[in-house]
């Protein structure tokens, strides 16, 4: 499918897509067909649905430098979106960590990054969306129009109410460089106190803070990385070659990156997960072409392992215990961060762990399917690994315990990966009554899966 380049192209493609939907069997469940290179979901799923093609909805239709907003198509990756906006000295308010996350995916499935302590999640800087609903309409949803219920109910719906074809998003001015400071703390408790102070004051040691995230390596080694835009840099590091970004956190106190490289600092090694493929071995790394050191390549390797189970077969031959994938992002209140990481460490032994503060941008907004307390500073905790299963236990042993702990601490869990909630608890957590009303209004014949079927039952 050719990329859409103009508004006229976009309107024609919308009409084509609506006609395509009319040709699909009546009553048959439908699903968006998209390439693996733009999928960042970590839940295996059974394919039982008729797919329709929206791959052509990629590209940036317009950038308004005066009003600082852009009209962007829903299947556009953040890699392409940033490439379009940076030449104008502008960027989305939140740029998720991985290049192939799409704008539409980040809005319907949530996203986060180190600007989230001041800008919230990507959906909070959306001005309006054209949404293809399950009943075949294309509706422009905005916070103050007749489809405001769809606008505020769309985040965390994961394509079960419809698909965003076009989004108008806010942009903010950026500088050419980012100055990083890596701050070490001896415990998560100390780190949590610093997170709260930095996010409230938006500075550290007299310097402005535009970005903040953290890396927990062990019970006695925890870092916060604070970043500030800079017009100049005395030197610039490059972590797309032999050097590995997350290792630099432990060895450097100051660093400078171009803004482009800062946005993608985690992508080259998929945070630290490239080690599972040998990409952090110096010899292998030299032979591994730089263009293939990126998150979507590692994702494809994961998909191959899931399909053929080679590593699991080898582990069993060696007599090693079965392991459960524990790939999750959760939000917990900052004052419960130490409790959660202590639990996670004792339960799974997963190290390192990523930490990213988050606060709702507009305290007056209500995002129905993923409600957060607007007065609370949360910390997103990201952990992407495996944990040994006790003899006789099945998948879900660790992940279900994590879900229960997050609920106990007053947090929330993102649904991009596996979930094991009982149905009643799920709907109580993720806006069940509101979701039911939205489903009736915009997908009355249930052509799209419901949220529980898609995220927990993996259909």
Residue ranges and their predicted role:
Residues 1-459:
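Noncatalytic alpha-helical scaffold of FAD-dependent oxidoreductases
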């Amino acid at each position: 499918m050719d990329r859409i380049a103009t508004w006229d192209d976009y309107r024609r493609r919308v009409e084509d897509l609506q006609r395509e939907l009319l040709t699909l069997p009546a009553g048959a469940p439908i699903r968006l067909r998209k390439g693996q290179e733009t999928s960042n979901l970590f839940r295996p799923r059974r394919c039982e649905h008729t797919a329709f093609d929206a791959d052509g909805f990629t590209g940036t239709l317009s950038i308004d430098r005066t009003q600082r907003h852009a009209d962007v198509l829903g299947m556009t990756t953040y890699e392409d979106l940033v490439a379009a906006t940076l030449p104008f000295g502008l960027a989305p308010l939140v740029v998720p960590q991985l290049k192939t996350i799409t704008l539409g995916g980040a809005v319907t499935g949530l996203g986060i990054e180190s600007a989230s302590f001041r800008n919230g999640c990507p959906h909070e800087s959306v001005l309006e969306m054209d949404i293809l609903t399950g009943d075949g309409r294309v509706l422009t949803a905005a916070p103050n129009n007749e489809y405001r219920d769809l606008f505020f109910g769309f985040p965390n719906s994961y394509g079960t109410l419809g698909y965003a074809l076009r989004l108008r998003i806010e942009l903010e001015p950026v500088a050419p460089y980012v100055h990083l400071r890596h701050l070490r703390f001896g415990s998560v408790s100390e780190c949590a106190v610093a997170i709260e102070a930095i996010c409230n004051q938006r500075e550290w040691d007299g310097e402005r803070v535009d970005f903040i995230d953290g890396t927990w390596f062990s019970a006695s080694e925890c870092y916060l990385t604070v970043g500030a835009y800079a017009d100049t840099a005395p030197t610039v590091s490059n972590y797309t070659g032999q050097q590995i970004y997350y290792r630099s956190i432990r060895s450097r106190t100051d660093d400078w990156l171009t803004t482009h490289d800062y946005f993608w600092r985690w992508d080259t090694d998929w945070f630290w997960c490239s080690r599972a493929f040998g990409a952090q071995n110096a010899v292998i790394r030299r032979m591994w072409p730089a263009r293939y050191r990126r998150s979507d390549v590692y994702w494809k390797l994961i998909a191959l392992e899931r399909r053929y189970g080679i590593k699991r077969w080898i582990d069993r031959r060696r007599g090693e215990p079965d392991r459960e994938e524990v790939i999750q992002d959760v939000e917990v209140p900052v004052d419960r961060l130490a409790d959660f990481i202590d639990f996670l460490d004792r339960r799974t032994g997963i190290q390192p762990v990523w930490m990213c503060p988050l606060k709702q941008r507009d305290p007056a907004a209500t995002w129905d399917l993923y409600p957060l307390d607007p007065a609370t500073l949360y910390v997103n905790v990201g952990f992407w690994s495996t944990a040994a299963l006790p003899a006789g236990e099945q998948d879900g042993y660790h992940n279900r315990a994590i879900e229960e702990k997050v609920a106990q601490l007053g947090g929330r869990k993102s649904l991009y990966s596996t979930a094991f909630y009982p149905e009643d608890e799920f709907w109580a957590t993720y806006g069940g009554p509101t979701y039911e009303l939205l489903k009736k209004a915009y997908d009355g014949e249930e052509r799209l899966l419901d949220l529980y079927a898609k995220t927990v039952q993996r259909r």
